[in-house]
Design a protein with these regions (language model features):
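A short, Lys/Arg-rich alpha-helix, primarily the initiator
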Residues: 1-14
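Residues that mark the N-terminal boundary/hinge immediately upstream of a DNA-recognition element
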Residues: 6, 17, 42-45
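Key DNA-contacting residues within the recognition helix of helix-turn-helix
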Residues: 8, 33-34, 47
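Residues within the alpha-helical elements of helix-turn-helix
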Residues: 13, 24, 52
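Short alpha-helical "recognition helix" segments of helix-turn-helix
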Residues: 20-22
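Recognition helix of helix-turn-helix/homeodomain-like DNA-binding domains
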Residues: 26-41
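Short, charged recognition helix plus adjacent turn
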Residues: 34, 58-75
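Short, basic-rich loop-to-helix N-cap that marks the start of a DNA-contacting helix
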Residues: 38-51
């Protein structure tokens, strides 16, 4: 999945809308909308949005399998 698709999936699972996510990270709804439309998003912005939903970015060896409830970002 693309990074923005992962964020959208987590938002859906948690019932968090764009406005609520924006409030959590201190940006306007339009900024969240624009970020989620991008194919590429900076690691900093990705981490910021994930942290607001109690997720974190972890780097592991590529040979390690993705477990249930984990995501793998495609480039």
């Amino acid at each position: 999945m693309k990074a923005t698709e992962i964020v959208k999936d987590i938002m859906e699972k948690q019932g968090v809308g764009q406005t609520a996510l924006g409030k959590r990270i201190g940006v306007k709804n339009d900024a969240i909308y624009q970020r989620l439309r991008q194919d590429n998003i900076s690691v900093e912005r990705l981490m910021q949005m994930l942290a607001a939903m109690d997720y974190k970015l972890v780097i592991v060896p590529a040979s390690k399998p993705v477990r249930e409830n984990e995501y793998e970002v495609e480039v």
